[in-house]
Structures are given as C-alpha cells and as structure tokens.
C-alpha cells in the first residue's frame, strides 16, 4: 500500500467573494491570514486537494482530451507534472499524511476512499485547488480527526519533502511508524 504526504495550502485571495474571478461557490470566504492552510476544510469535507487547475481535468477522456492534457502538462515544471500524475493515479486505500501548518509537527492521517475528481466550476486563475480525492480521515475516540505528531512517525519537519506539495513516502521506518501509530 502506498503512502503519500500532501500539503493543501493556498492564498486567501483565491476565494474572495468580492472578486468574482477568484470566488468558489460553497467554499469558505476569505481567511484571516495569507497562506492559510486549508487543512480544516479538507478534514471537514473528507478530501485532499492540490492546485494547478489550468492543466485541466486529468481524467478527460478520448484522444482530444489526452492531447489537451499532454499539452497542459508539458506547460508546467516537471516536478509539478509528477505531482499531478501521481495524485491522479494514487490507488484507493493509499495512506495520506496532511500537515497542520498552524501547529508545526501535527499531522492528520487518512485513507484515500474515492477516485480522482476535477472541479470544473472553480475559476482556473488564480484558484489552485481543482484536483481532489476523497479521504477517510483517522478519528479519535470523540469522532474528531486524529492528530499525530511528526516526531512519533519518524518524520523530520525541516526541509526535504515536507516542503513539497505532494510526495510519495518510501522510507520504511516512516511507513512502519505510521502503521504502528494507526493501530493504537
């Protein structure tokens, strides 16, 4: 079973109801600070999401769709191309870790429970989070999303893949620690 790390942050201006180009219906209004982390929205709605909506729907079918997506994917940097394709192809039941940027070192863990979705009704520019997956988040005894500490999962929070938008976790020390923590 694969394990992934995902950051779900975005700019507050991306959802300003006073600026029609960046407003997304049914999403929260502007947030209290720049670079607000959308983790709370993702937890409440059982999703993970990443940006680059201008690439378009990665599930668009047929030859025309494949060519359009290929052109769009070639327009982004190679590492972003990899993020998007890995996110799209992430198998069901994959384990995902999402950091809480308001409390460094806190993480939420969940299991991918739904296929890739692209939200066509979100503005493409400048909104960043059109690519989404459903997630069943681990819950504590009160039914709230369970908080894990990075240190307990053998994860260092400085540098490396912690700074990336999306990354597969291949280190068996980390994946074993995640499995042990989830059993408790």
Name each region found by the language model:
Residues 1-47, 126-184:
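Contiguous surface segments at macromolecular interaction interfaces
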Residues 49-138:
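Structured alpha/beta reader/binder surfaces that contact nucleic acids or chromatin modification marks
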